[in-house]
């Protein structure tokens, strides 16, 4: 969500404080440009499993050289709720794209689609940002009958996969072919 390009896994000894024990080992990995939280979590699980095995072998062999954790200010992640996972279409397109990837597969970024005076809750699963001039007011939906696009302040967002309330996830093409719509996000 915040544009980090690298992440990793750490093994450490537990002490009386949360996340303050001595570091045993660490492995880093690059966050891929189109990677969402679900895909990244799968990669980190595998990386973490390998690191746990290496750590246990080091402990068993008595070859552990720990380092203290850096003394940094504690930052608690906000609890994800419906109120703070709603898309803000007036944001920078790169921020919106990262927000969607960071909340995928759960809890999912969402928006409200307006269609002929009716508002529908809609989860957004996959988007692609196209930088350029602002075509319409941010949040306005436009289409060429093949792609569902939303105007943002510095270009447009292609909404590739979405899920209307009480429906299965679908591509934008499936939505455009299956529904009569006059949309606004």
Regions found by a protein language model. Name each.
Residues 1-83:
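Donor/substrate-binding cores of folate-linked one-carbon enzymes
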Residues 71-185:
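Internal anion-binding site segments
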């Amino acid at each position: 969500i915040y544009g980090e390009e690298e992440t990793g896994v750490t093994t450490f000894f537990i002490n009386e404080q949360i996340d303050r024990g001595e570091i045993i080992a660490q492995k880093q990995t690059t966050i891929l440009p189109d990677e969402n939280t679900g895909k990244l979590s799968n990669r980190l699980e595998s990386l973490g499993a390998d690191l746990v095995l290496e750590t246990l072998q080091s402990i068993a062999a008595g070859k552990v050289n720990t380092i203290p954790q850096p003394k940094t200010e504690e930052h608690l992640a906000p609890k994800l709720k419906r109120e703070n996972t709603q898309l803000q279409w007036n944001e920078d397109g790169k921020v919106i794209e990262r927000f969607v990837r960071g909340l995928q597969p759960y809890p999912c970024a969402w928006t409200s689609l307006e269609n002929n005076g009716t508002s529908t809750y809609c989860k957004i699963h996959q988007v692609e940002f196209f930088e350029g001039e602002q075509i319409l007011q941010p949040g306005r939906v436009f289409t060429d009958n093949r792609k569902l696009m939303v105007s943002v302040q510095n270009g447009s967002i292609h909404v590739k996969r979405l899920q209307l309330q009480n429906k299965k996830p679908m591509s934008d093409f499936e939505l455009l072919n299956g529904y009569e719509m006059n949309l606004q996000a």
